[in-house]
Amino acid sequence: MRIKNSVVVITGASSGIGRATALAFAAKGARVVLSARRKDALEAAARECEERGGEALVVPADVADYAAVEELARQTVQRYGRIDVWVNGAAVSLFAPFQEAPLDDFRRVLDVNVMGYVHGARAALEHMRRRGRGVLVNVSSLTALAPQPYSTAYVMSKAAVTALGASLRQQLRLEGHKGVHVCTVQPATIDTPFFQHAANYTGRQVVAMPPVYSPERVADTIVRLVRDPEPEVTVGPSARAVRALTRMNAQAVEKVMARQVDKAHLSRQDPAPAMSGNLYTPSAGSGDVHGGWHGRRRTAGRRLAMVAAAAGGTALAVAARRGALPSPDGRELSWPRTR
């Protein structure tokens, strides 16, 4: 699909990956429709999009509310006459021991991260199926491939998003909608404000687990998928490597992932008060693309080597430590080198 003048709806566009994606499409001349709960942040993002050469429409919405998502689609079609691309990117998270997670908070994560994507998919596909073409992009996570502890609701939601994409692709194929594509993006840890905004009942500050990649990397992947759709793609060498290692020895990866979350995802130095984060009320401010985590890469090679050693033995560990891993198709996967 040609990007210039295409109509692109993006949920979660006020910050992080969603905002970076809006800017990437705008820079290529797309007409972007920005949605999230924070109108002021969306308006700031819209100004940035217009400065980069795109046209922007702001439609605030809580994706957990289907009527609001339907209104988002209606306003898009009313303004531009069609929907070419829909990016489901709005997401929230909850960190807590499973037994201590407030059930209302747990349910809210699933409402936003699962039902929000269902709402977006229904609204988008209604228009795309009628026109016979379009691209739906669902932003999932590395945790859909390698689940982690203390964020059960989030992990469940991202696994559901991956399954949603696979199920929709099969249905569209059976119905003969060859021009309508559903793509799932599974990023590794990304440098966004997501972790600062998360609900947290662990008593420990949540930090981004290295290696950390830029949100622009995810945005560029999404733009590429619109031009050349693929069913599922990972973003970041660590995500590709973990996917390969999980296929070799899922149990070993699971054990190492648990240790690394305890050591590198939840701070042992900085306590944190219990809070519901942005689950019910949007975070204050005009929104940021980056979260200030991009320096957390120095121990990446050592961590991957641990996973590789547990999953596949010495040869894989050496390859991981040196900065490369074989992919399932035999190609080499690069990895950020330690310093």
Give the positions of each predicted feature.
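Active-site helix of classical SDR
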Residues: 121, 157-160
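Conserved glycine-rich cofactor-binding loop
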Residues: 7, 14-15
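Hydrophobic alpha-helical topogenic segments used for membrane insertion/localization
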Residues: 298-324
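SDR active-site lid
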Residues: 174-268
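Substrate-binding pocket helix/loop in short-chain dehydrogenase/reductase
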Residues: 97-98, 105-107
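The beta1-alpha1 cofactor-binding region of Rossmann-like NAD(H)/NADP(H)-dependent oxidoreductases
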Residues: 61-71, 103
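Conserved glycine-rich Rossmann-like NAD(P)H-binding loop of the short-chain dehydrogenase/reductase
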Residues: 30-44
